[in-house]
Amino acid sequence: MFYSYPYKALSFPIQCVWLKLNGSWPLTESSRPWRSQSLLATAYIVWAWYVIASVGITISYQTAFLLNNLSDIIITTENCCTTFMGVLNFVRLIHLRLNQRKFRQLIENFSYEIWIPNSSKNNVAAECRRRMVTFSIMTSLLACLIIMYCVLPLVEIFFGPAFDAQNKPFPYKMIFPYDAQSSWIRYVMTYIFTSYAGICVVTTLFAEDTILGFFITYTCGQFHLLHQRIAGLFAGSNAELAESIQLERLKRIVEKHNNIISFAKRLEDFFNPILLANLMISSVLICMVGFQIVTGKNMFIGDYVKFIIYISSALSQLYVLCENGDALIKQSTLTAQILYECQWEGSDRIEIQSFTPTTKRIRNQIWFMILCSQQPVRITAFKFSTLSLQSFTAILSTSISYFTLLRSVYFDDEKKLD
């Protein structure tokens, strides 16, 4: 039923299982219900829309609470932390559901052009796997976060100092259009419904970020392999066959370079909306979580731990993505330097014979490649911002500015009340 990529040795990170569980993984062409009337495919699509609906409904409950408590800056900022994360991943879920064909084509293109098998006789695949460890750390932090949101209210119920049967806690601050406290059945069903919506939000966040990082990491790996091929461009060709061999090698290098650039553009095109929403919301989220940690009064110790994990996971998620985007920029621009250093200028020093001299035709092609390679390959958020460490520092700077402003407003209000 699920789309099976052409290259059988391709294995995605374990986090991607959650995209299948949340209904976001593309199905095969033959599994489409309007073509083969597959009951499993139909059930899967219905499940996918149920997940989206449950997240949307939970966000509406949180928004109702937010609007009802706008006058309290502490409650507002606390609620914004979960509401904004929900909105971000609600957008992600809808984007993945509405762009299944693009997602399928992206996976297919990756399997043919970018994937580096683990059995490859080079250390590039091992380096790519090593770089993916950072996404496991990010996943662990986010998993701890949602577990704390779902478990801490239960700890409060069973081990808290005082239990109010009419004001039982939920994973997040919400207002319902019905009385969720009227009976234990209603409470339990509402708790399970909203908790699972939160699980879908967090798992979609780390699963989609992981697959984006997976694509970028192996694209960087392909640039590394390309650099190795460029370094050996003029090795082992005799004088009679020099030009023909060099031209053939250069042709394959150009084709591979174009394929890598083409995949990076498809990757950017697919993840554009998600990255834009992520970068816009991240600065606000980091600001508000930091504000909660600094200004929280009479807060349960578990809530402090929860917010510390929250800000750690938000920072790690943003840093890992920006660092991978920065690595792609560096690897792509390094191509020009590798081309320049590949001994293409040998024809002016034929007497040295330390390597096969190049013809003017080959030099012209290499010069053109150097010119093209000076333009970095990068992933942007609709061209508004580039995924790079520079963007990461800019977002942190913006978050600190928001935090300073919010803190000033809060303490000014405190002084007026005193």
Swiss-Prot record:
Residues 60-70, 162-195, 295-299, 407-418 are extracellular. InterPro entries: 7tm6_olfct_rcpt. The lineage of its organism: Eukaryota, Metazoa, Ecdysozoa, Arthropoda, Hexapoda. This is Odorant receptor 13a. Odorant receptor which mediates acceptance or avoidance behavior, depending on its substrates. The odorant receptor repertoire encodes a large collection of odor stimuli that vary widely in identity, intensity, and duration. May form a complex with Orco to form odorant-sensing units, providing sensitive and prolonged odorant signaling and calcium permeability. Involved in the behavioral responses to octanol, nonanol, and pentyl acetate. The keyword Transmembrane applies. It comes from the Eukaryota. GO terms for molecular function: ionotropic olfactory receptor activity; odorant binding; olfactory receptor activity. It comes from Drosophila melanogaster (Fruit fly). Disulfide bonds: none annotated. Residues 1-38, 92-140, 217-273, 321-385 are cytoplasmic. Its main location: membrane.
